[in-house]
Amino acid sequence: MEIRPTRIELIRTRRRIKLARKGLDLLKMKRSALIYEFLQISRTIRGMRENLRREVEDALNTIRTAEILEGQVALERIANMSSDSTINVDSRNVMGVVIPTLNLTYNLSILSDVYRTISVPVAINDAIDRFQRLFLNLIQILEKENALRNLLIEIDKTKRRSNAIENILIPRLEYQAKMIKMMLDERERDTFTTLKTIKKKIEAGKDEE
């Protein structure tokens, strides 16, 4: 590492140390915010997963009940009238991390809310509601799992950058500043000694006169 022992270089190096420390503080704050967001989503998704098994069992029970009460033919007929669903992918930004958001929409079909209220038996209606709710919850869990994955990648990246600044860049700059200061001090001492010697010679010359 080439060191230029000048006062300007010392000022620049000290300025770089200050900026590096400021950047390190910002990275640590960012990492703390990302970890907080990660833990919040983890708690939410844990609760959603715990409820998911019960929701699956409830949905299967309602479809069995509907089949017993209305028959398989009626179920299949209404199932064929159901609309396709579309998942739209959007995103939100959390401390510079792009988090995908998934929005579920149902396309228009014969099986409208009005038609269901008038023509679809209650047991089948209940089964439709349960499965739509279950599907929506699955989409939300998938969205949050993607968010956790992206946050984890960014947390790791931020940690590596922080470590590089804290353990490599700042110590290197501090060593550089220390060496420049030592070299400047040494130069000043040499200059002072030289001037002192010159002064003595001048004074000695005067005495000889």
Curated annotation (Swiss-Prot):
Superkingdom of the source species: Archaea
Gene Ontology CC entries for this record: plasma membrane
Pfam (any one): ATP-synt_D
InterPro entries referenced in this protein's UniProt entry, alphabetically: V_ATPase_D (IPR002699)
Annotated membrane topology: Peripheral membrane protein
Transcription regulation keyword on record: no
Intrachain S-S bonds: none
Localization, UniProt: Cell membrane
Keyword Metal-binding: no
Keywords noted in UniProt: ATP synthesis, Cell membrane, Hydrogen ion transport, Ion transport, Membrane, Transport
UniProt-recorded Gene Ontology molecular function terms: ATP binding; proton-transporting ATP synthase activity, rotational mechanism; proton-transporting ATPase activity, rotational mechanism
Any one GO biological process: proton motive force-driven plasma membrane ATP synthesis
Similarity-based family: Belongs to the V-ATPase D subunit family.
NCBIfam families hit by this protein: PRK00373.1-4 (NF001545), V_ATPase_subD (TIGR00309)
UniProt subunit comment: Has multiple subunits with at least A(3), B(3), C, D, E, F, H, I and proteolipid K(x).
PANTHER family from the UniProt entry: V-TYPE ATP SYNTHASE SUBUNIT D
Role: Component of the A-type ATP synthase that produces ATP from ADP in the presence of a proton gradient across the membrane.
Official protein name in the record: A-type ATP synthase subunit D
The organism of origin for this protein: Thermoplasma volcanium (strain ATCC 51530 / DSM 4299 / JCM 9571 / NBRC 15438 / GSS1)
Upper classification of the organism: Archaea, Methanobacteriati, Thermoplasmatota, Thermoplasmata, Thermoplasmatales
